[in-house]
Regions:
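Bacterial Sec-dependent N-terminal signal peptides
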Residues: 1-24
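Intrinsically disordered, low-complexity boundary segments flanking structured domains
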Residues: 11-15, 99, 131
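Beta-propeller domains
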Residues: 20-94, 101-104, 114-140
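Surface loop/turn signatures of beta-propeller and other carbohydrate-active proteins
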Residues: 84-85, 142-150
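Hydrophobic beta-strand positions that form the internal "hydrophobic ladder"
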Residues: 109-111
Length: 150
């Protein structure tokens, strides 16, 4: 009886579950990008030129928020954000940037950057999505904050 009740409960909830689409857009290479929001990859344009190590984030509906190569940060209109140049990641580092939502502030994201291979520095910058008319801004006071240095 317990198994039947569990099955009925799950089958009643599943149709109401919604997908998380925060990773629908991928930006990489020389002007290359893909949009997976339709279920199949669709080529879209990108102003970014990089050899490796990019990161992008969309909202839960799949709408692009911003993307970066670890050096420049682009908003959803594919324009560099205010204070969005000069991050200290390295475009030839395999994973030069990682975007993580700030658990304490839903309108903010951390961009973690890694410098050139062997340099050993690991930094973060904060993007505040309430600034610049909702397109986001790299918060100058947090830009390139050093976490580790070897």
């Amino acid at each position: 009886m317990k198994k039947l009740l569990t099955l009925l409960l799950i089958s009643g909830i599943v149709p109401f579950a919604t997908a998380q689409n925060e990773a629908d857009k991928w930006f990489f290479g020389t002007g290359a990008a893909l949009d997976f929001s339709s279920g199949s990859p669709v080529v879209i344009s990108s102003p970014m030129n990089t050899s490796e190590g990019t990161a992008a984030v969309s909202d839960a509906t799949g709408k692009l928020r911003f993307f970066t190569n670890g050096v420049d940060v682009y908003d959803s209109t594919k324009t560099i954000m205010p204070n969005g140049t000069g991050l200290m990641g390295d475009v030839s580092t395999t994973q030069s940037a990682l975007i993580v939502p700030n658990p304490a502030a839903s309108s903010q994201y951390y961009i973690f950057t890694a410098g050139a291979d062997g340099a050993g520095d690991f930094r973060y910058s904060i993007v505040n999505m309430t600034l610049n008319g909702g397109l986001g801004d790299v918060v100058l006071a947090s830009k390139n904050t050093l976490l580790t240095d070897s």
